[in-house]
Every structure is written in C-alpha cells, then in structure tokens.
Amino acid sequence: MPQLNPAPWFAILVFSWLVFLTVIPPKVLGHTFTNEPTSQSTEKAKPEPWNWPWH
C-alpha cells in the first residue's frame, strides 16, 4: 500500500508549502494601498434644509 508510505508525498507537501510561503508573501505585501485612511472629525455635520419649490 504505497499511500501509507509518507516519504514521497510528505516531502513534496512540505517543499511545496515552503515554496509558497517564500514566494507569495513578498508579492502580496509588495502592493501599496492607494487610499490611505484619514482621520475624520467627531462632530456631526448639521444638514441644511432643502428649499422645495411648491409649484
């Protein structure tokens, strides 16, 4: 029963995860965010009433 022998597939699994973890994170972390968060004031804006034309 070759599936019970962990030598070939376990080495391939570990090596593939090692490659993924060394290649993918620098690519993902290399992206820059275009919209930097800005601080907003805590005061609520007072809405102005609309002047509806009642024709």
Swiss-Prot record:
Tell me the GO molecular function terms.
proton transmembrane transporter activity
Q: Name one GO cellular component term.
A: mitochondrial membrane
What is any one GO biological process for this UniProt entry?
A: proton motive force-driven ATP synthesis
Return the annotated region ranges for Disordered: 34-55
This protein's membrane topology, according to the annotation, is: Single-pass membrane protein
Question: Which domain of life, per UniProt?
Answer: Eukaryota
Q: Which UniProt keywords apply?
A: ATP synthesis, CF(0), Hydrogen ion transport, Ion transport, Membrane, Mitochondrion, Transmembrane, Transmembrane helix, Transport
Indicate the transmembrane segments per the record: 4-24
Give compartment(s): Mitochondrion membrane
Which residue positions does the secretion signal occupy?
Answer: none
Name the major location: mitochondrion
**Annotated S-S bridges:** none
**What family is this?**
Belongs to the ATPase protein 8 family.
Q: Which PANTHER family match?
A: ATP SYNTHASE PROTEIN 8
Quaternary arrangement and interactors, per the entry? Component of the ATP synthase complex composed at least of ATP5F1A/subunit alpha, ATP5F1B/subunit beta, ATP5MC1/subunit c (homooctomer), MT-ATP6/subunit a, MT-ATP8/subunit 8, ATP5ME/subunit e, ATP5MF/subunit f, ATP5MG/subunit g, ATP5MK/subunit k, ATP5MJ/subunit j, ATP5F1C/subunit gamma, ATP5F1D/subunit delta, ATP5F1E/subunit epsilon, ATP5PF/subunit F6, ATP5PB/subunit b, ATP5PD/subunit d, ATP5PO/subunit OSCP.
Q: So what does this one do?
A: Subunit 8, of the mitochondrial membrane ATP synthase complex (F(1)F(0) ATP synthase or Complex V) that produces ATP from ADP in the presence of a proton gradient across the membrane which is generated by electron transport complexes of the respiratory chain. ATP synthase complex consist of a soluble F(1) head domain - the catalytic core - and a membrane F(1) domain - the membrane proton channel. These two domains are linked by a central stalk rotating inside the F(1) region and a stationary peripheral stalk.
Q: What name does this protein carry? A: ATP synthase F(0) complex subunit 8
- Lineage per the UniProt record: Eukaryota, Metazoa, Chordata, Craniata, Vertebrata
Q: Which gene encodes it?
A: mt-atp8
